[in-house]
Amino acid sequence: MGKYKLILIGSFPPPVGGVSIHVKRLKENLEKSNLSYLVVDIKRDGLKTALKSVFKGNVVHLHTSSVYLKCCFSIFCLLVNKKLLLTYHGNLNRYGQLKNSLDKFSIKIAHVPIVLNRSSLEIATRINRKSVQISAFIPPSEIIELDNETIKKIKDLKSRCSVTFCTNAYNVSYDKSGGEIYQITALIELFNGMPERGLIISDPSGMYIKLIKEKDIHYSDNILFLSFIHDFNAIIRDTDCMIRFTSTDGDSLSVKEALFAGKPVIATNIVERPAAVTCIDNNMHALTAAVSSFKPHFVENYTENGFSELYRLYCEN
């Protein structure tokens, strides 16, 4: 028996990202529970420390976007007879042949693979019958307010635009076809031609504004970049609609945070989305039609919380 019931291994902000925010909120909820646990930040503590921590617990829950780390921990936990719960924070089969094969290998030998949508569950259960689908969304415990200068910029943008949208990209990432996953340059092109509609781009890593400058891409004054660390929930709250124009996805944290705030969402239909989302095809024609016809409205607040299902899984194992 290990000293702890659970060893939680993952990355924490900064940098800000869907996985790191999920792990941070998971830890915050564990602090309120009666479960004995140990948290390891794999980026700061290192791989060696993370592997050593496995011996201290009965159940290991790993959060990583690296297919290589997923395979490494799957093999290691199998060899030392530890139960590995492994969350796949993206749509399965989104990589090329090698990485997809490695993902499937780790699914096969993990104790319980956890996926985020129905299409991934169909793939995972064919490989490992213990696979489960659990939402990555855990509601935020607080919203960190924006600084006064940023608030002023947003107010100015809203005063000049009839409708204000927001989108986010934690970094510049590309899909297996070489296209932008977040398709920010396509959004810029669209909003450059819609001066009456505003767009706030959450770019906490600063990588997108760097790319835009390097490529000398023009963006008009109805587009506002926020290229510093901030709470995207504060942006969602102050805009009319959130756009998720991605070429691939998992269980988007941003989509559910917008719905949790009662805000409408326009998103590509490349994965299963919550019922309240306006789903569009992944092309500019569909995006243009959705943005140009959008009228501000309130949606029923999203009430899902993935922590309760995860907690049950921890207790059962």
PLM feature spans:
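Nucleotide-activated donor-binding/catalytic signature segment of Leloir-type glycosyltransferases, i.e.
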Residues: 210-228
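Conserved catalytic-core segment of nucleotide-activated headgroup transferases in glycan assembly
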Residues: 149-210
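A short, histidine- and acid-enriched strand-loop-helix "catalytic/donor-clamping" loop
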Residues: 67, 82-98, 109-112
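Donor nucleotide-sugar binding/catalytic pocket of nucleotide-sugar-dependent glycosyltransferases
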Residues: 108-155, 159-160, 164-168
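An aromatic- and histidine-rich active-site surface loop
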Residues: 49, 60-80, 178
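Short hydrophobic beta-strand element within catalytic cores of glycosyltransferases
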Residues: 264-268
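A charged, aromatic-enriched C-terminal amphipathic alpha-helix characteristic of glycosyltransferases
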Residues: 281-317
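Aromatic "clamp/platform" in nucleotide-sugar-dependent glycosyltransferases that forms part
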Residues: 247
